A protein has these predicted regions:
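Bacterial N-terminal signal peptides
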Residues: 1-3
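Sec-type signal peptide cleavage vicinity
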Residues: 5-258
Length: 258
């Protein structure tokens, strides 16, 4: 974790409640690290694995409305926090909330969320007056990574579509994304690493063996992708589709037939 975020006014040194809180920000990258270990440690992925000055999150304190917070630019003091409780919980979303969810408090704590983009959620607990607050983020969606049979980013001519449900409901105050049961299956274009961002899926029920879950198109020919065994689609756990000779390997170890 890098401690970037907090500045301090000399005039306020005598009153701790007026000093800016130092926020240290970290992202749980264990699932990505495990993936690279299984496939290629030299693989560089376009995922958010650290924060930089100027990144904007949405932050809520003690279930109050979410407000934009530019890391390393904005500051927060205990004096500005409207709560009398001793143990305070901070909640944060990245990217920032840009719809009506940004102004919803605990009474309306859910929002609809569309698949495709990467979503992270962070939480921290601190005793009121504490100088340092450590926000720890986790991935709430499921990144999909296309590799070739040698474990390198796939840059061939094939295009891949998965046919899954792609809309969820997110709890704004624990970050969890659940599948919207009313959502219909739709075609989801899976981006390549070279596109500069990964396609992220909504967490959903286990894909059952035998299900047709998409298709590969190459030079006008289309072939179905059928799961040979049950496959989990769970938050934070990246899915790898590796193109090997005459087959596709799903998640680094689960074979699919085309």
């Amino acid at each position: 974790a890098a401690c970037l975020f907090g500045c301090q006014q000399q005039d306020n040194l005598q009153d701790p409640s007026k000093e800016a809180i130092d926020f240290s920000i970290s992202i749980d990258n264990q699932s990505i690290t495990d993936l690279l270990t299984r496939n290629s440690a030299a693989l560089s992925l376009p995922v958010k694995n650290s924060f930089s000055t100027g990144d904007v999150i949405s932050m809520s304190v003690s279930n109050q409305d979410y407000l934009p917070f530019a890391l390393g630019v904005d500051s927060q003091t205990w004096d500005e926090i409207d709560t009398d409780v001793e143990s305070v919980t901070f909640y944060a979303h990245y990217p920032e909330l840009t719809d009506e969810a940004a102004t919803r408090a605990l009474g309306k704590r859910y929002r609809s969320i569309k698949g495709g983009k990467e979503h992270l959620f962070g939480i921290a607990q601190a005793i009121r007056g504490t100088k340092n607050v450590a926000l720890k983020f986790k991935r709430m969606t499921v990144p999909v990574i296309l590799l070739d049979e040698d474990g390198r980013p796939y840059n061939g001519k094939a295009s891949i579509k998965l046919r899954l449900r792609n809309r969820g409901i997110q709890d704004l105050f624990n970050g969890k994304v659940e599948l919207d049961k009313s959502a219909e299956a739709e075609d989801i274009n899976i981006k390549k690493v070279s596109d500069g961002e990964l396609t992220n899926l909504i967490p959903q029920e286990t894909i059952k063996a035998g299900e047709v879950i998409g298709e590969v198109s190459i030079e006008g020919e289309k072939q179905k992708i059928v799961a040979n065994q049950d496959v989990e689609v769970s938050a934070g756990n990246a899915i790898v589709m590796r193109f090997a000779r005459n087959r596709v390997i799903f998640d680094g170890h689960t074979p699919l037939r085309r």
